[in-house]
Amino acid sequence: MNVIPCSIKTLKGLYDISGVEVGQHLYWQIGGLQIHAQVLITSWVVIAILLGSVIIAVRNPQTIPTNGQNFFEYVLEFIQDLSKTQIGEEYGPWVPFIGTMFLFIFVSNWSGALLPWKIIKLPHGELAAPTNDINTTVALALPTSVAYFYAGLRKKGLGYFGKYIQPTPILLPINILEDFTKPLSLSFRLFGNILADELVVVVLVSLVPSVVPIPVMFLGLFTSGIQALIFATLAAAYIGESMEGHH
């Protein structure tokens, strides 16, 4: 079984998937590059919300914490607990990475329901949550893949690759393909759930614009938070797995 060409083909497929389009899109032409403007705009808004809220809440830490400081301390403790549970005692260096993934995805998902993106008119397409676009979810999944390969190589050196022939060399092709398909599952799970949630809300609003969409929107907020938690948990679990060397 020729594994290396299969793995290369899988990576090429993941790269090609990043070009998949749903609906119309607005592009900026910068030099010789075509930039997906909608994703950049909404991502910048999400990043600005995160940075702004953190700066406002903790720019002047108090001995007796304010409500904002308490909130972000709770978030930090939550991310530390999640990282420690999945990675183990060496979780410390990975808290910023896992926390960034969780917070960006969480705020991105919620922005699709809470921010009035559609009042901003564009020449082509419309604004939506960044995670509503496959380009964003693939861009989040690829660094996760790099992170767990890096974690394993840093911990075990070239001995890291010994896991591919455990418990038996017969499983070598499956073990290799498993690692290269992890970013596919991460990106499609997040993209599919967020896109489906927004489509359901749009359809219900068009059919019954007053009452029915409200509970569906609350359910969407809940599932959006769960999707952020699932992504961060799986990312931490993959990193912990690569450092421990077991499946």
From Swiss-Prot:
Domain of life according to the entry: Eukaryota
Membrane association type: Multi-pass membrane protein
Keywords: ATP synthesis, CF(0), Chloroplast, Hydrogen ion transport, Ion transport, Membrane, Plastid, Thylakoid, Transmembrane, Transmembrane helix, Transport
Transmembrane segments: 38-58, 95-115, 133-153, 199-219, 220-240
Pfam families: ATP-synt_A
Gene Ontology molecular function, alphabetical: proton-transporting ATP synthase activity, rotational mechanism
GO cellular component: chloroplast thylakoid membrane; plasma membrane; proton-transporting ATP synthase complex
Keyword Plastid on entry: yes
InterPro entries: ATP_syn_F0_a_bact/chloroplast, ATP_synth_F0_asu, ATP_synth_F0_asu_AS, F0_ATP_A_sf
Compartments (UniProt record): Plastid, Chloroplast thylakoid membrane
Oligomeric and partner information: F-type ATPases have 2 components, CF(1) - the catalytic core - and CF(0) - the membrane proton channel. CF(1) has five subunits: alpha(3), beta(3), gamma(1), delta(1), epsilon(1). CF(0) has four main subunits: a, b, b' and c.
Record family assignment: Belongs to the ATPase A chain family.
Function: Key component of the proton channel; it plays a direct role in the translocation of protons across the membrane.
Protein name: ATP synthase subunit a, chloroplastic
Organism in which the protein naturally occurs: Phalaenopsis aphrodite subsp. formosana
Gene that this sequence comes from: atpI
